[in-house]
Amino acid sequence: MPKLSKRLAGLASKIEDRTYGPLEAIALVKDNANAKFDETMEAHVRLGIDPKYTDQQLRTTVALPNGTGQTVRIAVVTSGEKVAAAKAAGAELAGDEDLVEAISKGEMNFDLLIATPDMMPKVAKLGRVLGPRGLMPNPKAGTVTTDLAAAIKDFKAGKLEFRADRTGIVHVRFGKASFTADALLENLKTLQETIDRNKPSGAKGRYWKSLYVTSTMGPSVEVDFSALQEIGQEG
């Protein structure tokens, strides 16, 4: 088992072995995010699902109300005059067969790939390149669409695609350590509601098993997910 660095061990010693209320957990992680850069805040949710079964898979999007604090580089595979329209809407890269060819050769200078339905037969051939990176466009994720301008705007504003990994854990960045605790809580609450709203039909037993929040270089803190779910339900 790898040893914790002295710095991380020192930070972890400030955290008690218990679950924390959502706002308290966020404040604690923020307090420990003291690297020389603006650390990314991450949520790690263990769900009671087995994604090897199709009715227990989770893949969707969340529109974080306060954004992620990160610049998203978007590439669009489309055709005709829509190529210029995609660039005008804010896409860093846009093209048709030429972009498909570039991607097939390993040119991946983007964080998100959007495609129009007419180009999906060509994009589908890139599965070996895009699949392992989680970049294959998908209608459920809003990355296969005819409304390119709206999709580009939404993803630039903080819309995120996420999925449960093969062990049933969801990993999502939900802001920066420089955000206020209230802004981060609002983002985390939106994520929780999205996960609950998209509960797979085949999920059995307890859906939420654990929730941890952490920063890029900091220790993780366990959050009382029931308290998070109860926010806004008072009265």
UniProtKB/Swiss-Prot annotation:
The keyword Ribosomal protein applies. One of its GO terms (cellular component) is large ribosomal subunit. PROSITE patterns: RIBOSOMAL_L1. Pfam families: Ribosomal_L1. It comes from the Bacteria. One of its GO terms (biological process) is translation. CDD domains: Ribosomal_L1 (cd00403). Keywords: Repressor, Ribonucleoprotein, Ribosomal protein, RNA-binding, rRNA-binding, Translation regulation, tRNA-binding. One of its GO terms (molecular function) is tRNA binding. Coiled coil: none annotated. Disulfide bonds: none annotated. Binds directly to 23S rRNA. The L1 stalk is quite mobile in the ribosome, and is involved in E site tRNA release. Protein L1 is also a translational repressor protein, it controls the translation of the L11 operon by binding to its mRNA. Part of the 50S ribosomal subunit. Belongs to the universal ribosomal protein uL1 family. This is Large ribosomal subunit protein uL1.
